[in-house]
A protein has these predicted regions:
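Iron-sulfur-cluster electron-transfer modules
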Residues: 161-165, 351-478
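Ferredoxin-like iron-sulfur electron-transfer modules
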Residues: 298-318, 347-368
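N-terminal small/glycine-rich loop or linker at the start of catalytic domains
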Residues: 163-167, 342-347
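Short, structured secondary-structure boundary patches
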Residues: 93-97, 221-225, 266-272, 339, ...
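Noncatalytic alpha-helical scaffold of FAD-dependent oxidoreductases
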Residues: 1-249, 254-295, 299-300, 304-328
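Generic preference for hydrophobic/aromatic residues in regular secondary structure cores
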Residues: 132-137, 174, 329-332, 408, ...
């Protein structure tokens, strides 16, 4: 729902409205420009992962970390901890994780060395007294810290990678009094089991009482849609009805929780929200049925399917971790966008114009360098998929030519050197601008590439060493 506290926190109508817009998810207006303040990033950090036999014992240890000023405390249930088996170098043995156990992943950020030294001595001792086990102790090394954080960071995509192909992934965001978390986690697990979400993992920001859970779901059948609806209904009853919690903490309400806003806030506050909406957007043009809705079934309508595309990319959960490293992200598409468009095409949802545009945007501009695989939590190389696409669309003549060229590359190099030498010689006679104009036309009919004055001179052929003196190793120093 809307952040109604803005009505009592501010007096000027513009201030009130501006603060309502911030959490309104585009249903009242939008900000075209935002200035953000930066926050302090202390240079010294230390962290640890402490394992407990139960969620209750992990929560009992939470005040120790909070009172010492922990900047982050994450809770991981037993299913979350077992996902470490998919890491390249897991920090602990996942086979030793007991049922119903839990862990706290915590970090301290400081400016002084003596503060870090104090914490690395006092925290392990205090947590051990409360039944905790720190398999790695306290860690200050950046590379090791990143590896620990990858357990938490990769939970959502890891669940996605283990799911059956063609299914989707749901992640929800709930908030409770942190003292209720042991009971909440236990009952959430029962709800997931009841609705056959057996791969669900539960984790969250422990000191804030903020829980997330992620699970795979099959939306390709009526039964799958009913199980999804049942899960959300029971989750709402547990959160609001039993524990007086909130159905949203840091994620947006969206369409998934819109039918439950009145249930959480009551009729009076819900009516105020609708009055605000009707004043700002009387025709309901802005994001209809998002955050507020009169359709109590909107969360189970127009559900997004996951059509099968290719074994290379079907496990993609569209998390977007690949996007920052993609060379073509500022030009055409990212790996995630390439996969999403292919799913739209496979499902028959795409406009015909998309098919034409995808040839250049999706296929021709992909660098196929595999950087996306390095960033991807489930090791998807979209470039491999694009190579398959290119091969599928290649003509027989094209395959023969490329195959011959690959097997006669020294001759291709000879031709390239000759072409550069001829181009440079012609440029001296005709001039660079004239040659560029001529080759622009020859390029259009496929006779030559377009000339560029900045092309280098042809390099000399590398010397070939024919004698073998039996050296086992050859070192190169740049």
């Amino acid at each position: 729902g809307y952040s109604l506290n803005a009505i009592i926190d501010y007096k000027h109508p513009l201030d009130i409205f501006a603060h309502l817009i911030v959490g309104a998810e585009g249903t009242l207006a939008f900000f075209s420009d935002v200035v953000l303040d930066t926050i302090d990033d202390p240079p010294l950090k230390t962290m640890g992962l402490v394992l407990f036999d139960s969620v209750a014992s992990s929560m009992a240890a939470l005040p120790v970390l909070v009172n010492e000023g922990a900047d982050a405390v994450e809770m991981l249930d037993d299913a979350s901890l077992r996902t470490a088996q998919y890491l390249e170098n897991p920090p602990y043995d996942h086979l030793q994780i007991l049922d119903n156990s839990a862990a706290l992943l915590f970090e301290f950020q400081k400016h002084q060395v003596n503060e870090i030294e104090h914490l690395t001595q006092s925290i392990p001792h205090a947590l051990t007294l409360m039944g905790g086990r720190l398999p790695l102790g306290m860690i200050s090394n950046d590379a090791q810290r990143l590896q620990l954080w990858n357990i938490r960071k990769g939970l959502y995509p890891t669940v996605g990678s283990m799911r059956k192909k063609g299914t989707s992934v749901i992640t929800e965001d709930l908030c409770y009094d942190y003292r209720d978390l042991p009971k909440v986690v236990s009952e959430l697990k029962l709800i997931c089991q009841q609705w056959q979400y057996d791969d669900a993992v539960i984790f969250g920001h422990a000191k804030d009482g903020n829980l997330h859970f992620a699970a795979s779901m099959d939306l390709n059948s009526i039964d799958g849609e009913k199980r999804f609806e049942g899960l959300l209904n029971d989750m709402a009853k547990l959160t609001v009805g039993k524990f007086d919690g909130s159905l949203k903490a840091e994620h947006g309400t969206g369409r998934n929780m819109a039918p439950f806003v009145e249930y959480e806030w009551g009729g009076d506050l819900y009516n105020i929200m609708w009055k605000i909406k009707n004043l700002a957007d009387p025709n309901s043009i802005l994001n209809p049925d998002v955050l507020l809705t009169k359709d109590n079934k909107t969360h189970v309508k127009n559900l997004k399917k996951m059509p099968l595309v290719s074994d290379e990319v079907d496990l993609c959960v569209e998390c977007g971790f690949c996007e920052p490293v993609c060379p073509s992200k500022e030009i055409t598409m990212t790996p995630r966008q390439r996969i999403v468009v292919q799913r739209e095409i496979a499902g028959g949802y795409a406009d015909p114009s998309v098919l034409d545009a995808f040839q250049y945007d999706g296929i021709e501009t992909c660098a196929t360098d595999g950087l996306c695989e390095i960033a991807c939590p489930v090791n998807i190389n979209t470039g491999t998929f694009v190579k398959w696409f290119r091969q599928k669309n290649e003509s027989t003549i094209g395959k023969l030519i490329s195959g011959w060229a690959a097997n006669h590359f020294s001759f291709i190099q000879f031709l390239a050197r000759g072409g550069l030498s001829m181009g440079k010689a012609t440029q001296k006679i005709l001039g660079g601008p004239a040659l560029k104009v001529i080759t622009r036309y020859t390029n259009k009919i496929g006779l030559s590439p377009q000339w560029n004055e900045k092309l280098p001179y042809a390099s000399k052929p590398l010397l070939t060493i024919k004698e073998n003196h039996g050296a086992q190793w050859v070192y190169f120093f740049g």
